[in-house]
Amino acid sequence: MRHPLVMGNWKLNGSTHMVNELIANLRKELSTVEGCGVAIAPPAIYLNQAKHELSGSRIALGAQNVDVNLSGAFTGETSAEMLKDIGAQYIIIGHSERRTYHKESDEFIAKKFGVLKEVGLTPVLCIGETEAENEAGQTEAVCAKQLDAVLNTLGAKAFEGAVIAYEPIWAIGTGKSATPAQAQAVHKFIRDHIAKQDAAIAAQVIIQYGGSVNDKNAAELFTQPDIDGALVGGASLKADAFAVIVKAAAAAKKA
């Protein structure tokens, strides 16, 4: 059985005080939770602080981005080896905000995926469609294209131990969310698409849902067979709301 993962993406939020307080509250809220992996991705400047605050807990450290280069004259970038050195494990790539604001292509994101695998880190590959693409019935075609950038260059084996986050762009930060049935249909498509190349890998890959997951809708989403946790945005900045989501994932997979 797949082990669900709930990951908090803090985006461009934080302060030294907030990092200490939020992690302390998360540790308290999640101290007895079992059966669900948990990770947080603070801004890069707070990774070292977060690492120390998480010490001895079951909460893993993640990051929000990585560069394709390992070293050199690339001002402002952070390499996979640096993230590994600091203790980060789960690295978000392909987030719609990176694709939109930084014009990151599927091919560029696939390179990031490969670099992370090479150094032993876990890619959290975000894929998903815009509202216009959704309304045009292109959801599956868009997700397939984004997956194929990795499948066609690195093969299905690259998804062993990796994480995929399906994030319908029209549902991010909008308060809208796909219904559990809608989300399940896309998650099943993603798993089936990988299974065309390797059924065993497809069966074990974690596929999170990442479209406005909150403490109100999480439990119903997690009852779906192909939804393995969540990539959480705004709700991850509140320890109590994030804990409800984690507990819902753990409970759903025990049922």
From Swiss-Prot:
Amino-acid positions noted as binding substrate in the UniProt annotation, renumbered to this chain: N9, W10, K11, G173, S212, G233, G234
**What is the reaction catalyzed?**
D-glyceraldehyde 3-phosphate = dihydroxyacetone phosphate
Keyword flag Isomerase: yes
What Gene Ontology cellular-component terms does the record carry?
cytosol
Q: Which GO terms describe its biological process?
A: gluconeogenesis; glyceraldehyde-3-phosphate biosynthetic process; glycerol catabolic process; glycolytic process
Which residues act catalytically here?
H95 (electrophile), E167 (proton acceptor)
Tell me yes or no: is Isomerase among this UniProt entry's keywords: yes
Keyword tags: Cytoplasm, Gluconeogenesis, Glycolysis, Isomerase
Enumerate the GO terms in the molecular function aspect.
triose-phosphate isomerase activity
Which family does the similarity line name? Belongs to the triosephosphate isomerase family.
Q: Which NCBIfam families match?
A: tim (TIGR00419)
According to its UniProt entry, the function of this protein is described as: Involved in the gluconeogenesis. Catalyzes stereospecifically the conversion of dihydroxyacetone phosphate (DHAP) to D-glyceraldehyde-3-phosphate (G3P).
List the PANTHER family hit by this protein, alphabetically: TRIOSEPHOSPHATE ISOMERASE (PTHR21139:SF42)
Put simply, this protein is called Triosephosphate isomerase
Q: Which organism is it from?
A: Yersinia enterocolitica serotype O:8 / biotype 1B (strain NCTC 13174 / 8081)
